[in-house]
Amino acid sequence: LRVAYWKRYGATLLGMIEHHAINPHAFLQDTHPLPDLLAKLGPHKALQESLRRLKGSKVILTNAPRHYAHAVLRHAALDALVEQVICIEDMCFAGRFRPKPSVAMLKMICARLGVSSRQCLLVEDSVENLRAARRLGMQTILVLEHGWRGRPRSAHAGHARVLTHQVHSARQLTRLLSVRSSPAVKAER
């Protein structure tokens, strides 16, 4: 059910609201437990160094709930390295949640940040989210996790048209961006 709603709506939460009339805030709290994750997670030195070296504003844009995103960032010692964290609770307008990959939400976020979408770079692990960003003219980088053998989690035919680049690590991202100048970096990991 979780995967089916994620594929159909872009976020499991939207399917749960649509079909089960759940309380979204209770759902987000109950479905994002932290203790097990935090036990496996520690400071991420390579990512810390990469974020320190990147030019431009760094904004986390995540479909995760606020309590979860902030706890993960603190535990990984990344919280002081980003200017802003935009969570799923912030992706609500006209009385409805509009998480990634909503093009309308991405436009709203750009307006809120006071930047043109063409000034933004979205670093993501979801091709669908990158596709929405490319429709607005954003630069895009697909993060491939180790062990995927080059296949993104949400691979679709023709995904190369929505990608500016692909990377496998924080160090590779830093090297790639060190040769480019980007006024705003939007990161999600």
PLM features per residue range, with description:
Residues S57-V59, Q139:
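Proline-centered loop/turn at the N-terminus of a beta-strand
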Residues T62-A64:
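Conserved phosphate-coupling serine/threonine residues in phosphotransfer and NTP-handling enzymes
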Residues K45-A46, A104:
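Short, conserved clusters of charged catalytic residues that mark active-site
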Residues L1-A4, P35, S57, F93-F97, ...:
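Conserved short-loop catalytic and cofactor-binding motifs
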Residues L1-K45, R66-H70:
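N-terminal helical cap/lid subdomain that shapes the substrate entry/recognition surface
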Residues L38-G42, I60, F97-P101:
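Short, surface-exposed alpha-helical recognition segments that flank or form part
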Residues R52, R66, H70-R189:
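Asp-based, Mg2+/Mn2+-dependent phosphohydrolase catalytic module
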Residues A46-K55:
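Catalytic-core regions built around general acid/base machinery
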